[in-house]
Structures are given as C-alpha cells and as structure tokens.
Design a protein with these regions (language model features):
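Long helical/loop segments within the catalytic core of UDP-sugar-dependent glycosyltransferases
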Residues: 106, 110-140, 153-237, 278-289
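Catalytic donor-sugar/metal-binding loop of nucleotide-sugar-dependent glycosyltransferases
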Residues: 244-262
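N-terminal signal-anchor transmembrane helix
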Residues: 28-84
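Juxtamembrane C-terminal module of membrane proteins
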Residues: 27-50, 293-309, 327-421
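A conserved acidic beta->alpha catalytic loop
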Residues: 82, 91-100, 119-121
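Acidic donor-binding loop at a coil-to-helix junction in glycosyltransferase catalytic cores
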Residues: 237-243
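Cell-envelope/extracellular polymer assembly enzymes that use nucleotide-activated donors
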Residues: 53-56, 86, 227, 242
C-alpha cells in the first residue's frame, strides 16, 4: 500500500477548497432564500408618471419548426399593450419550414415579422443573429427569448416595470422553468439544477452583491446599453455571460426578477445534454481567457470577486472533487493509505447534508416541487448527476487547451410533443 505526505497534503487541500466554496454557497443560499421570501410579496409595477415603453422582442431561430408556432402564440399573448410590441424572428438559414410557419402567423398578426439572415452571414451562432436583429429593430427596449420559450403572460410586463422604474439598471432577468421536467430522470435532474441555480446563484448574488448573470433568454435590456458596450461578442459561445461582465463595467446593474417566468425545453437525452453543457463550459473557458487577465483591474470589485468565484467553481472545485473522489476510490481499494488527521468523514457527511438541505429548501419556493420524490432525486443527484459535470469540464478543457478545436455553436435538439405549462 502506497502512502506519502504529498497524498495527505493533496487530500487536505482538496477538502479546504471544497469547504471554502461550500461556505460561500451557504451564504448565497441564505441571502437567496430571504430574497425569494421578499420577492414573493412584490408585484412589479411602473413607477408613478411612467408609461409602458415600446419593446422589440427578438427570437433567434434556426430549424425551429417543432416549437416556433407555440412560442409565437405565447409572445402574442403577453399582458402588455399590443401596440407597443414588435416581434422579430431571426431566421438563420432554417431548412425545416420554420420560415413558412412564421410567415403564416405574421399574416395574421402584424406585430410579427421574419428577418432572414443573408446566406453569407448564416450559421454563425446566436450572437451574430442577435446583432442583425437589433440593427433591424426599431424600439429602445429589447427583449430576448429563445425559440422554444413559453413565457407566462405577465413575464414581459414584470421585466419592463422593474427596468423602467430603476435608472441604475441596464437589464432585468426573469426566471426559467423546465417545461418537460417530468419526461424522464434526466429532465427531472435538470429541473432541480435549474431551480437551485436561480434561487441560490441568481437570487443570492443579487441580494448579497447586486450581481445577476444574463441567462440568454427571458431578459430585457436597453438598446443604448448594448450600443455602449459594443453588442454581443460573436466569438463567445456563452454570449450572455460575456456580455454581463461588460455591462457591469459601465457601472450599471442587472436585476433578477423571479416574477417574470418563461418555460423552456431541456435536453431529454444524455448525448444532447453533454453537447449543450460542453458548449457552455467551452464558452466559459473563452470568457475566463478573455477577462481573467484583467481580474485585478475589473470594476466594480464585486465583479472581480464573482469572476474569481466562477474560476474556482469551474476549475479548482472540479479538480478538488476529482482528486478527492480518486483518492477515496484508491484508499477504498487498498492501493493507497491516507494519514491526514481530522474528522474528514464527518466533514464529508456535513457537506452532503448541507447540499440536500439547501436544494430541498430551495425547491420549497416552487409550487409542487418540494415532494418526497424530488428530495430523493436530490440525494441521487449528489452522487450521479453532479459528478457528470466533471466529465464536461475535463472534456471542454481538452477541446480548448489540448486539441484546440474550433468553437462552433451547437444547436440544442428540440422536442415537439411537449405540452405548454
């Protein structure tokens, strides 16, 4: 049996990194939970003397025939002055009848129009499509939705009310829900993950630090802000996260508005999930490479802190989990011996219980999600679903650092037989 001091040191260092992040996560959980309690009693309304501004709703679409009609139905059903809305579907070279569906619905509702991306500019990803749409839009307020979204009627109204009533805000971000969450085990895990992210990371960071990350859909932003920061980065696979940093550097903020809800499809196949999550991870690699070198110069300071947290979460924590898992397996098989002194088994048990407690309480903020079955899934996710992220991060690092593969936008597979919420 092999043993050495460096193995013990490696194990202790991994435990220290994990517990530092667990402590910070616990703080975000508490502040996020308190924010969820406060926001439950707040109905977003316009400040006195203000009027509802005209909004351009932009929807990038590439081969979205399965879902685009339902999305347009929901966008047209917004509880918002009808004469203050234009809906632009950015058709990025669709070959499945998406354009024909949009044209048919546009003939019935004058607010809808299709913007065809020129062939020589097509297939360059969401950022490029949105840039074309902004240039073609006419209103000062921009709202972004993905082509599979089913926003609730009051969603746009909530986003706009908070944004217009607070001059310090550059954008407002709503909440997304998983429309196909009951389809299979994977979508149930994704549903739990999404709720935990929003009520812990989004709500917690907003309440504690005044920070929120643009999620890529269900958000409203001022046109002049987009112009000031130079629009979307066309090289970014996670254009929302990259844009968030540049917005905060202007001194403005982005607010999480949980009353603004949209329902979206999530991957139903593990293969689709890996493709999507790898794109996210590679997108974050790009963001880190672009902005991490300016870490000490970033303003406000909380922005630098948040980027550092993201770096630790993606790399240090994943490395610590991988190392601790590996040492645990090697020690359990008798190949190595660890002699680090400390109540590590009790610490691990406490970390596990905190995970279950935090996510379980978070689920209680959503109607119908705090079931015993979901609590069992939370326990299972700790040992299964959460560990899949290790593979995603390693795969993304291999693609970017070792193999240096070209970053290409990978469209997420859609499913047509999902009922509206």
């Amino acid at each position: 049996m092999y043993s050495s001091r460096w193995l013990d040191a490696l194990f202790v260092a991994s435990a220290a990194i994990l517990w530092f992040m667990i402590a910070y996560q616990l703080l975000l959980f508490v502040t996020g939970y308190l924010y969820s309690r406060r926001s439950a009693w707040i109905t977003p309304t316009l400040a006195p003397g203000l009027e509802w501004p005209a909004v351009s709703i932009l929807v990038p679409a590439r081969n979205e025939a399965r879902v685009i009609a339902r999305t347009l139905e929901h966008l047209c059903a917004f509880d918002y002055p009808a004469d203050r809305i234009e809906i632009i579907i950015v058709d990025d070279g669709s070959q499945d009848g998406t354009g024909a569906i949009v044209d048919e619905m546009a003939a019935q509702d004058s607010r809808i129009r299709r913007l065809q991306v020129p062939a020589h500019l097509g297939g360059r990803g969401k950022s490029a499509a949105l840039e074309l749409a902004v240039a073609a839009s006419k209103n000062e307020l921009i709202a972004i939705y993905d082509a599979d979204n089913c926003p609730e009627p009051g969603s746009l109204r909530a986003l706009v009310a908070i944004l217009v009533s607070n001059p310090s805000l550059a954008a407002t971000v709503g909440k997304f829900r998983c429309i196909n969450r009951r389809r299979n085990l994977l979508t149930r895990f994704i549903n739990i993950e999404g709720l935990a992210f929003q009520w812990i990371m989004q709500a917690g960071r907003w309440s504690l630090l005044g920070l929120t990350t643009l999620p890529g859909t269900n958000f409203a932003i001022w046109r002049n802000v987009l112009q000031e920061v130079g629009g979307w980065d066309k090289d970014a696979l996670t254009e929302d996260a990259e844009l968030t940093i540049r917005i905060y550097e202007t001194g403005r903020r982005i607010r999480f508005v949980p009353r603004a809800v949209t329902w979206e499809q999530e991957p139903e196949k593990l293969r689709t999930w890996f493709r999507q999550r790898t794109r996210w991870a590679r997108g974050h690699n790009y963001v880190f490479a672009k902005h991490a070198r300016r870490l000490l110069a970033l303003r406000p300071r909380v922005l630098a802190m948040d980027l550092l947290h993201a770096l630790l979460l993606y790399y240090a924590v994943c490395a610590a989990i991988f190392i601790s898992d590996l040492l645990f397996l090697l020690a359990g098989s008798g190949l190595v011996s660890l002699h680090a002194i400390g109540p590590y088994s009790h610490i691990w048990l406490l970390a596990f219980l905190l995970f279950v407690l935090e996510v379980g309480i978070t689920l209680s903020r959503e109607k119908g999600e705090d079931s015993f079955f979901n609590l069992v899934l939370v326990v299972c996710a700790y040992f299964t679903y959460c560990q899949l992220w290790l593979i995603v991060v390693i795969r993304a690092l291999l693609d970017d650092v070792v193999l240096r593969r070209k970053r290409v936008w990978v469209k997420t597979e859609r499913f047509s037989d999902v009922r509206s919420p």
